[in-house]
Amino acid sequence: MPVAVGPYGQSQPSCFDRVKMGFVMGCAVGMAAGALFGPFSCLRIGMRGRELMGGIGKTMMQSGGTFGPFMAIGMGIRC
């Protein structure tokens, strides 16, 4: 498939670049969602102090790691 050229000689990002960008955006959105919802779930079960911070970080990584591949697959379908 030929690469499209923009109006000023700029080429479009490749399919792999789009998939990477989707993965990074999905991880960022998932981690932000984990930062918003993580404290509520951790406080609800009674975590405090260092355990609370670890639980929030774990929730952020889990939600980012879950949403990132879905966004990457979505961007791959659009290629």
Curated annotation (Swiss-Prot):
Record-annotated membrane-spanning stretches: 22-44
Keyword line: Antibiotic, Antimicrobial, Membrane, Mitochondrion, Mitochondrion inner membrane, Transmembrane, Transmembrane helix
Membrane topology category: Single-pass membrane protein
Main location class: mitochondrion
Matching Pfam families: Romo1 (PF10247)
GO cellular component: mitochondrion; TIM23 mitochondrial import inner membrane translocase complex
Location in or out of the cell: Mitochondrion inner membrane
GO biological process: cellular response to reactive oxygen species; defense response to bacterium; positive regulation of reactive oxygen species metabolic process; protein import into mitochondrial matrix; protein insertion into mitochondrial inner membrane; replicative senescence
Residue ranges of the region described as Sufficient for antibacterial activity: 42-60
Free-text function comment from the UniProt entry: Has antibacterial activity against a variety of bacteria including S.aureus, P.aeruginosa and M.tuberculosis. Acts by inducing bacterial membrane breakage.
PANTHER family: REACTIVE OXYGEN SPECIES MODULATOR 1
Family note: Belongs to the MGR2 family.
Annotated protein name in UniProt: Reactive oxygen species modulator 1
